């Protein structure tokens, strides 16, 4: 297997046909409607109303005068108004920390596979390295090298990622980034 993102992205790859259920409705999260805006519901693009760090949003064009916003960088308040005030910056950073904690419990958990024999060594990978890892792990098994395995599927990392790493003396991280992205 050639382990190149470029190869994956530029070549035609065969897959099993995708199945789609036309009755399925996507959960789009906290989206404020035109009716809610018209009724005067408080909309702040960075306003955390329930403590999970994830604010409501609107779709472009939802309402002709309400629900739109413009922002730049991190110098903004809960209502996307420009500010250089320290407390507003701290408030936004604390909201982002809450958002990350919320997301850790909602994103797909890592896939953890125990080695066929007890080991204190492990390997961690993610993304397009998966096919190469399957091939490599099979070859290592034939050579008598057994590794616990974890395929990370999302960021921010679930608590299980830190627990997995802490449980091993040696952890090999396989990725395709010169500067150790993971």
Model-identified regions with their sequence ranges:
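Flexible, low-complexity linker and terminal segments
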Residues: 1-182
